[in-house]
């Protein structure tokens, strides 16, 4: 599986270079801070704290 791996401060999305495997989900997290909205994309589907929106998916680059 190819998941995009990016934090909001990174200028562009880049593949994770083999860190995701066939049975691993991709994830897209968003949350608000005092500086505005933040986004984090990567591999896996972690448990998150209340207030963080998490979307997990199972196809290549589905976390765009």
Swiss-Prot record:
Task: List the SUPFAM superfamilies.
Answer: Snake toxin-like
One Gene Ontology MF term? acetylcholine receptor inhibitor activity
Entry's transmembrane regions: none
InterPro entries in the record = Snake_3FTx, Snake_toxin-like_sf, Snake_toxin_con_site, Toxin_cobra-type
Keyword set, alphabetical order: Acetylcholine receptor inhibiting toxin, Disulfide bond, Ion channel impairing toxin, Neurotoxin, Postsynaptic neurotoxin, Secreted, Toxin
Give compartment(s): Secreted
Q: Which cysteines are joined by disulfide bonds?
A: 3-26, 20-43, 45-56, 57-62
Tissues where the protein occurs: Expressed by the venom gland.
- A Pfam family this protein belongs to? Toxin_cobra-type
Give the record's GO CC terms: extracellular region
Q: Which domain of life is it from?
A: Eukaryota
What does it do?
Binds to muscle nicotinic acetylcholine receptor (nAChR) and inhibit acetylcholine from binding to the receptor, thereby impairing neuromuscular transmission.
Q: Which family does it belong to?
A: Belongs to the three-finger toxin family. Short-chain subfamily. Type I alpha-neurotoxin sub-subfamily.
- Record-given protein name: Short neurotoxin 1
Protein species of origin: Bungarus fasciatus
Taxonomic classification: Eukaryota, Metazoa, Chordata, Craniata, Vertebrata
